[in-house]
Design a protein with these regions (language model features):
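A structural signal for short beta-strand/turn segments enriched in small hydrophobics and glycine
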Residues: 21, 25-26, 60-62, 66
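Ferredoxin-type iron-sulfur electron-transfer modules and their immediate structural context
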Residues: 1-55, 99
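Flanking helices and flexible, charged tails adjoining ferredoxin-like Fe-S electron-transfer domains
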Residues: 43-55, 61-161
């Protein structure tokens, strides 16, 4: 358990990004997202890897080529297209929850943190106001905020209807 906790912390706070998992993924399921650093940001490096669940076929390339013996397809923060995909997985990650009104709405966030790797638990649902308040303290929630605000193209139409 100590190893998993250290690796989760290392990946999210590491001062360097090798990006090997991004380079070797044949489906482009691992991408590097620029994130703010310093100040109130929970990140120490300007790039974070996000794993996109819908694009991954779990070929294992990212794990095979990882110089840190990681398994990015299981360990990196994962963007799920809907709540049921997140609930069926054990990966740390999140899904945006919209009502039928959809676009323009401030979504709730369904999130499973890296700590779930140690003791898998069900995801936690946070209302928009609640999860927005945690963007400076929780790396996964901060990453979700970056995707929502700066990379909405990663959110499929299915995401907007979940």
């Amino acid at each position: 358990p100590d190893f998993a906790e250290r690796e989760a912390a290392r990946c999210l706070s590491c001062g360097s990004a090798c990006l090997r998992c991004v380079e070797v993924c044949p489906n482009r399921a691992n991408i590097a997202i620029p994130v703010p650093t310093g100040g109130a940001s929970p990140f120490s490096q300007g790039l974070q890897i996000i794993h996109i669940d819908d694009l991954c076929n779990q070929c294992g390339n990212c794990g095979f080529f990882c110089p840190y013996e990681g398994k990015p397809y299981e360990e990196k923060s994962t963007l799920f297209s809907n709540s049921s995909a997140l609930e069926q997985s054990t990966n740390p990650g999140f899904a945006f929850i919209y009502t039928e009104a959809g676009k323009g709405e401030k979504p709730a966030l369904l999130v499973r943190t890296n700590k779930a790797l140690l003791a898998p638990a069900g995801p936690e649902k946070l209302d928009y106001k609640d999860w927005q308040a945690k963007t400076s303290t929780d790396p996964i929630i901060a990453l979700a905020w970056q995707i929502l605000k700066e990379h909405p193209y990663l959110l499929s139409d299915q995401t907007r209807q979940s």
